[in-house]
A protein has these predicted regions:
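Hydrophobic scaffolds flanking metal-cofactor catalytic centers in soluble metalloenzymes
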Residues: 29-35, 39-60, 67-68, 164, ...
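Ferredoxin-type iron-sulfur electron-transfer modules in oxidoreductases and energy-metabolism complexes
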Residues: 3-24, 45-72, 76-78, 86-120, ...
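C-terminal amphipathic alpha-helical segment
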Residues: 259-295
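Cofactor-cradling patches in redox/metallo enzymes
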Residues: 159-249, 280-297, 302-396
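The −1 position to Zn-ligating cysteines in a subset of zinc-ribbon hairpins
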Residues: 29-32, 36-39, 72, 78-82, ...
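Cys/His-rich zinc-coordinating "finger/knuckle" motifs
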Residues: 37-43, 47-48, 80-86, 90, ...
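Iron-sulfur-cluster electron-transfer modules
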Residues: 18, 24-27, 44, 56-227, ...
Length: 396
């Protein structure tokens, strides 16, 4: 009788040392409760789950078996939100990816993304000379610290992706309506480095961050406002970020303008909207109220919350470098999200992230949610007739 085949686990102390170094020691903090696996959105779709606890355990033991799983992670942070030991699991995953680069265990095509960044300054492989083509006809000035209070950082997706370009143009309309003096870097705008960081190539990201820090210092920018939450998050990982310049997502700036009574909205016909919180605002930066403050200020808008909202948001599936990897239709979180949004009876599914917009529009199409329109908050603000508020007696 043949004995059953069993997996033999060979512990590798040398590899464990490299795991510790790559994850800055955080991989050792996991004590295997399994909460991470239970809350991972991969458990909601047809494909195999990541098995986060298993990845962490194999990493702790220095054994193989985690390489494929770490590339499925969207770094959404759902696991971290519920981890009783507060292990920074997303950072551990990025650390393991950095080790995978060293061991050349990287999915096909990802090195090409980084080479596009190296040669063309963007992960889309588009020419730098076309970076500001999205702004044709808008007459946006080149940023000048003596004239402008805000440097608008557009980002690669909003610069090159056709749908993202519409978002960038809407943000420009919002800033102009609010009376904000701003400029951009035009074709000189560099990639923030998000793809390098999210794909785990830490050394390349550090070089990008250093070069960009020098460039922004030379521009004498004191406030940088981003179109994408991913760019916003990436800038916060630059060394000395708070000392050099302030960085905000555009929704945070608009929230402050609304709260200060500096902008108002003409309003819309009575409309139900629901909001999808981007992971890189809601979980990574605890920012959930800014968009709701803005929408609540628009006459005619009624906010219908989805069950999974704010810090409990469901990832769209586009983070953690997954925008550059293929996901089977049955494994796309955004399809479930679109169905959830349609179930609220809302006419508009609003969000504040170009990656989320791309995934959710695809999800709405697959889900057959024909009556649900996906739009960015800046587009809703323009639709609602944003403008500078009329001065009150107290402000005259």
């Amino acid at each position: 009788m043949t004995a059953p085949t069993r997996e033999v686990l060979l512990l590798d102390d040398d590899r464990w040392d490299r795991v510790l170094l790559a994850t800055k020691g955080e991989a050792a903090a996991c004590y295997q409760c399994g909460t991470c696996t239970a809350t991972c959105p991969w458990g909601l779709v047809a494909g195999p789950s990541i098995g986060v606890r298993s990845v962490m355990r194999r990493a702790q033991l220095g054994i193989d078996g985690w390489a494929e799983a770490v590339w499925r992670c969207t770094t959404c942070g759902a696991c971290e939100e519920h981890c009783p030991h507060e292990v920074p699991i997303s950072d551990v995953m990025l650390g393991l990816r950095s080790l995978a680069w060293e061991e050349r265990s990287v999915p096909q095509g990802l090195s090409g993304v980084l080479w596009d960044m190296h040669w063309d300054g963007n992960p889309w492989g588009r020419p730098p000379s076309a970076r500001s083509a999205w702004a044709n006809g808008l007459d946006i000035p080149r940023f000048d610290a003596t004239k402008h209070s805000v440097l608008l950082y557009v980002g690669c997706t909003a610069s090159y992706d056709r749908r993202g370009q519409k978002i960038a143009r809407a943000v420009v309309s919002v800033l102009r309506a609010a009376g904000i003096s701003f400029g951009t870097l035009g074709d000189e705008e560099p990639c923030c480095g998000d793809p390098a960081r999210s794909l785990g190539n830490e050394e390349y990201f550090k070089r990008i961050a250093q070069a960009n820090s020098h460039k922004l210092a030379a521009e004498r920018a004191t406030e940088v406002v981003t179109v994408s939450p991913h760019c916003y998050d990436t800038f916060t990982h630059y060394p000395g970020i708070g000392e050099a310049f302030r960085v905000r997502h555009y929704s945070q700036l608009l929230r402050d303008l609304v709260a200060e009574g500096k902008v108002s909205f003409a309003g819309v016909e009575p409309t139900k909207v629901t909001f999808h919180d981007p992971c890189y605002l809601a979980r990574h930066h605890d920012e959930t109220e800014a968009p709701r403050t803005i929408m609540a200020a628009i006459p005619g808008v009624s906010i219908e919350e989805m069950e999974r909202s704010r810090e409990e948001t469901l990832c769209c599936g586009g983070g953690g470098g997954r925008m550059w990897m293929e996901t089977l239709p049955e494994d796309r979180f955004a399809t479930s999200r679109a169905r959830e949004a349609a179930g609220t009876g809302a006419s508009y599914l609003v969000t504040t992230c170009p990656h989320c917009i791309s995934c959710l529009e695809d999800g709405a199409s697959v889900a057959g949610a024909r009556n649900l329109k996906v739009m960015d908050l800046a587009e809703l603000a323009v639709l609602a007739g944003i403008g500078a508020a009329a001065p009150t007696e107290a402000s005259r």
